[in-house]
Amino acid sequence: MKIIDEIILYENPDPLLVSKQGIFPGIVKLQDNSLLALFTIGQAFDSADQRTYVSKSFDDGRSWSKPKPLHNHIYKNKEESESLKPLLLQNNKLLAIGYAFVRPDSLTPIVNPNTFEILPLNNKISISNDNGESWSMPKNFNVNETPLEISGPCIQLQSGRILGAAPPFHLKESDHSGWISYSDDEGENWSKLSEFYKSKEGHISTWECRLCETNSKIIVIFWAYDNKNKKNLSNHVVISDDAGKTFNTVIDTKIRGQASNIMFYKDDIIFTIHCHRENPTGLILRKVDVRDNKFSILDEINLFSKDGLSSDDTNISKQFGSLKFGQPSILHLNNNELLICFWCIHDNQHIIKTYIVNI
């Protein structure tokens, strides 16, 4: 594997005049082979004015259109800072699914640094019927009355069912689990299908879950964090043979990564990508064989490695607040190319960056 191109999808065009920080990207390929990216722009990493923006590429990710807001709603009372990821349905309808924090004012942080309580969170969905040119105002939905950290894209199974993987969003020392949620009516109604992971003591979080469907399996990868001992664990993987209803024993990948992602390639081969925020740091793409419910690395490449990428891991709140890069994704462009997308800090600005990788 080798990098053949490096592109900035978004950066603040006027950094000396205004603060516009780009974070949390997600990309889908549309029916006409164009690419659509959703990402968040706000004044700061946790600012109350964060909104979802839309950008398109018509040349396999080599250039991108000027981003435009997904919606122009003006909040009269409390603002909502949002993050949404795209999903293309089989009927070519587009969904943007994620969450928004309800902000009482512009200076109250998402996480209370003393109590670790988080602000109220609403799960959100928006719909586009015109290839992403216009979108409905994001509306609330709920899964068992539980706010979920839906930070990654949902998937639509071959059966038509939509699945999402996410944990209930809280920072307590226990009562953590990873949920599979589903919708059988294109996102109108949602329910909990299963728990893909829960530790015996409930002290391990399943942050930034991502999932994919292979020919016969559902695979979920997640950032495992031990809240009791306040430390990161290796990325973990779970596999389902019955469309997400039940999951086999968890697989410790032995990869010391945090935010990660996963893409089905062919047969029993997947690609994974991992943010390594503990030394040695980097953004590592891996080709993996998952035959017989194992995790065998076939090849890997470090795409993004430089000094100063590590995070403060004193506790999970400080870790969230000191991130330098994250939320990587993998998109298969053609037989030999993958598009890797993530956010990172460059010249004191949060930007959206991509790599084209020949595999």
Where are these regions (language model features)?
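Asp-box/BNR beta-propeller blade signature and adjacent active/binding-site loops
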Residues: 1-359
